[in-house]
Amino acid sequence: MFELLLGLLALCLLLAHLARKFDVPFAVPLVLAGMALAFVPGLPEVEFEPELALALFLPPLLQLSAYRTDFPAFKSHLRPILLLAVGAVLFTAFVVAVVAKWLVPELPWGAAIALGAILAPPDAVAAAAVLKDLKPPKQVVTVLEGESLLNDASSLVLYRVAVAATVAGTFDWGQTALAFAGGAIGGAAIGWVVGRLAMRVFVALDDTLHDITASILAGFAAYFAAEAVHASGVIAVVACGFMLGRQQHHIFTARTRLEAKAVWSFVEFVLTSLIFMLIGLQLSGVVERLERYDWTQLGLLALATSVALIVSRFVWMFFIAWVPRRLSRKLRERDPMPPAAHLTIMSWAGMRGVVSMAAALALPAGFPGRDIIVFLAICAIFVTLVVQGTTLGPLIRRLGEVEPDIDGPAPEQMAARRQVASAALEAVEDKLNDPEHGAAAVDLVQEYKERVDEAVALEDGREPEREHAAQRLRLRLEALEAARAKLVVGREEHDVAALTLLTEELDLEEEQIRRELGETA
């Protein structure tokens, strides 16, 4: 099994490279490859333990998404985010349940609602994987990422209540509402507490490697602590991620932030790649258990369910955008109707993934319609990832909603850079009359004045100054290359520790220059 895991990772790396080369979301070839491998004779069957999948994959990926989220933008878009994360989940679950009950009358209502809850939430991992290389409007990205952080909680609460109701034979909507409210509040509180405790741990550890390890463990701690008291582990992880993301500049050293980014990027790539591959690998076992069914009927059922899933999101998206503003003049004035293009993009960006698969496989043995539900979950993941995932980019470009490419840093980035440079200049100027630091301050003032002038020129877009600043930065890159080449040629003359230190300094300086040029993310 270990050899198979290494082989899957190698294949994921190849597919990710090909996906970038052919400009397709890399989640798509991963799922397709997993489905193809599922029918390769002689390969060992890969068991997908659903509880392990939720516990292993969700906490770090959700924590990282929350950590990177623009929290002020998240708060300013909280209304549409909640309308999608809660309202769209409930509406979609209801539509899918009605369609499933209509097409499969023998399916109990509880099982049909469980199916709806399984398929309702667009997946955070899938959304991030598909949107990563696209450039939709920032407002669209904020709402979609915010939705994907919270919708798993609402869908899992509805799913658990529906499963329990099916087993017990009764369904209580009041219990569902109470469970959702309690789970959300409890999860948020536990995530906040774990985040605060984690910050105390970081201060006590004061070591880069230990801090990074503790930051990874914090998400798992929040998830398991919340699940232990039947609160929402998803909300707990998101709350913990928000807390750490907001406080990272106070609790982490510069070295910790730089090295943590590399570690988290690696973790994200490995977990994201494996989860999509594992989703595809589940197809073989499901097909074997469905041999007794009429495949024409199953195909029509899968098609109808997937269409209901996609159409219901369009209906809900345009309904919540149009009806409340039609009824409230204050809302229209405070929050004008978003462009139809934005609504179309958000409606089409409803890819399903790990949560839907894990929830379907977590259904108890003997659950009514379990095999059909698992089959429909795989079909929905396949359709939304392959159809919507591959066409989302062309749709965004066709609607003309691609953020324009900017030669160099974005204006808002340069505004922040100017403020930082101005603050640094003021701090140095304050030391000009200091007997202890005056001479050194005189030397630094001119350097920081040049940085401020350069930032102002780039922010205002004045072409001559902008081009001159860019030429200076590129010349500095050439100088760094010459310095690095000298180190390589004379590496036998230098102590290994000194060589390593100088190389790190040159690498950091190069990264800073490339960021100023806008050449790195």
Where are these regions (language model features)?
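Transmembrane helical cores of multi-pass secondary ion antiporters/exchangers
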Residues: M1-P411, A415, Q419-S422, A497-A521
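Cytosolic C-terminal regulatory domains/tails of membrane transporters and channels
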Residues: P404-A521
